[in-house]
């Protein structure tokens, strides 16, 4: 997980270096770099939070699994 964060940081640094060669960053580019930096920071602080996603109770998981055949059957009729 740490290696992927390091790779992501290197990619952002490389993109920033390419974009700033001989020119200033435009507003959209600055916004994009800031957004990427925020996402990398969030992953570095709590890597499990990004991977887990929203928490579901066991009953919600069971109900969604039990409802799959009905959803697939309804989709097949369309």
Swiss-Prot record:
One Gene Ontology term, aspect cellular component: synapse
Keyword entries, A-Z: Amidation, Cleavage on pair of basic residues, Hormone, Neurotransmitter, Secreted, Signal
Originating gene: PDH1
Family recorded in the similarity comment: Belongs to the arthropod PDH family.
Example GO molecular function: hormone activity
GO BP annotations, alphabetical order: chemical synaptic transmission; response to light stimulus
Modification type Alanine amide: residues: 75
One of the Pfam families matching this protein, by short name: Pigment_DH
Keyword Secreted among record annotations: yes
Annotated compartments: Secreted
Cited InterPro entries: Pigment_DH
Domain of life: Eukaryota
Signal peptide: 1-22
This protein's name: Pigment-dispersing hormone 1 peptides
Tissues and organs where the protein is expressed, per its UniProt entry: Eyestalk sinus gland.
Function: The pigment-dispersing hormone causes the migration of the distal retinal pigment into the proximal end of the pigment chromatophore cells and thus decreases the amount of light entering the retinulas. May also function as a neurotransmitter and/or neuromodulator.
């Amino acid at each position: 997980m740490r290696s992927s964060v390091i790779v992501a940081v290197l990619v952002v640094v490389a993109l920033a270096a390419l974009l700033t060669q001989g020119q200033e960053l435009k507003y959209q580019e600055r916004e994009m770099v800031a957004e990427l930096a925020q996402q990398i920071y969030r992953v570095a602080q709590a890597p499990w939070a990004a991977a887990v996603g929203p928490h579901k109770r066991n009953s919600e998981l069971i109900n969604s699994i039990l409802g799959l055949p009905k959803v697939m059957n309804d989709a097949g009729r369309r």
